[in-house]
Regions:
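Intracellular loop-helix junctions on the cytosolic face of multi-pass helical membrane proteins
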Residues: 1-10, 101, 105-116, 127-128, ...
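Central cavity-lining transmembrane alpha-helices of secondary-active solute carriers
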Residues: 49-67
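Conserved small/polar residues in nucleotide/adenosyl-binding loops
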Residues: 287-296
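Helix-loop boundary and gating motifs at the non-cytosolic
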Residues: 2-55, 251, 264-280
Length: 298
């Protein structure tokens, strides 16, 4: 088995640059979904129900993408086709989701539309996100992996910061941060539009700049035979892999499991909590108002 060559900083950057756009999309989703559904007419105290389907899809999509991409060999690479398709779907859904209240639908229909688009958005973001992590494992040697993941972490946090700031930035530019009842404000809509544009441009950049190894090159650098690898991959599934996972995997997984309790509460209820405690918005009265508007629309 040959040693994987050292990559220049530029090449390590190119491997993960698309992650910047993916994280902008993820930040826009996590920061604004509660606001969008509350605007559409959802009870602010029951917003967590809208978050049930997206994580379920993530449980399925992430291992499926990993398993399928392990067995995929195309002229475009093995990971890049998945991240490009995921990003393309995410861009489409990001243009639709904030407009759920602008299509003239009844409140119930708008919320169902929003729920379905949220499910596809979370699924497509997961599909676009995971291949970037796999590219580092495929193409970076052990000596440079710490640097590669540090670059990825920097781009991840930078993208999150940009995504969180976008609505404030566009409001400061004079784009309306308020809208008629049941309609998402333009500052949020344009945040999703610009985020979608940055996402696809970042992914196109990585797609154009990164050339994945051929099956022969992969086998040469990773000590595997591609035909044997494909044959072995077909003998098991991700459930089998879970049963044989090392103890460290389960320890880290347990910590992550409890961390995500806090993340979901934070993303779902922070907006309403800040509105009630910092700005004095009466969320109970707001709930009754939206319920009355829902009855009128129905």
């Amino acid at each position: 088995m040959k040693q994987k060559p050292d990559l220049s900083f530029r090449k390590l950057w190119d491997l993960s640059f698309g992650f910047f756009g993916v994280q902008i999309a993820y930040a826009l989703q996590s920061a604004n979904i509660a606001r969008i559904f509350a605007t559409l007419g959802a009870d602010p105290h029951s917003l967590s129900y809208f978050w049930i389907l997206p994580p379920l899809m993530g449980i399925l999509v992430q291992p499926i993408v990993g398993s399928c991409s392990d067995r995929t060999w195309t002229r475009f690479g093995r990971r890049i086709p998945y991240l490009f398709v995921g990003a393309a779907v995410a861009v489409l859904v990001m243009c639709l989701l904030p407009n759920a209240g602008s299509f003239g639908m009844a409140v119930s229909a708008a919320m169902v539309f929003g729920l379905v688009t949220l499910m596809f958005l979370d699924t497509s973001i997961n599909m676009a996100m995971q291949p970037f992590k796999m590219l580092v494992g495929d193409m970076v040697n052990e000596k440079q992996k710490a640097l590669a993941y540090s670059i990825q972490s920097f781009l991840c946090n930078a993208g999150s910061l940009v995504g969180y700031v976008f609505p404030f930035f566009f409001t400061a530019l004079g784009i309306a941060n308020t809208a008629p009842s049941g309609v998402v404000p333009d500052s949020v809509i344009w945040s999703f539009y610009i985020g979608a544009a940055i996402l696809i441009l970042c992914v196109i950049y990585t797609t154009a700049r990164v050339k994945e190894w051929t099956p022969a090159e992969y086998a040469e650098y990773n000590g595997t035979n591609s035909s044997v690898e494909q044959e072995e991959a077909g003998k098991g599934d991700w459930l089998t892999l879970l049963r044989h996972a090392p103890a460290t995997f389960w320890k880290v997984g347990l910590v992550q499991f409890f961390c995500w309790f806090a993340f979901m509460y934070m993303w779902t209820y922070t907006n309403g909590t800040v509105a009630a405690n910092c700005w004095g918005v009466d969320t109970v009265s707001y709930t009754h108002l939206r319920a009355h508007e829902t009855e009128l629309h129905l």
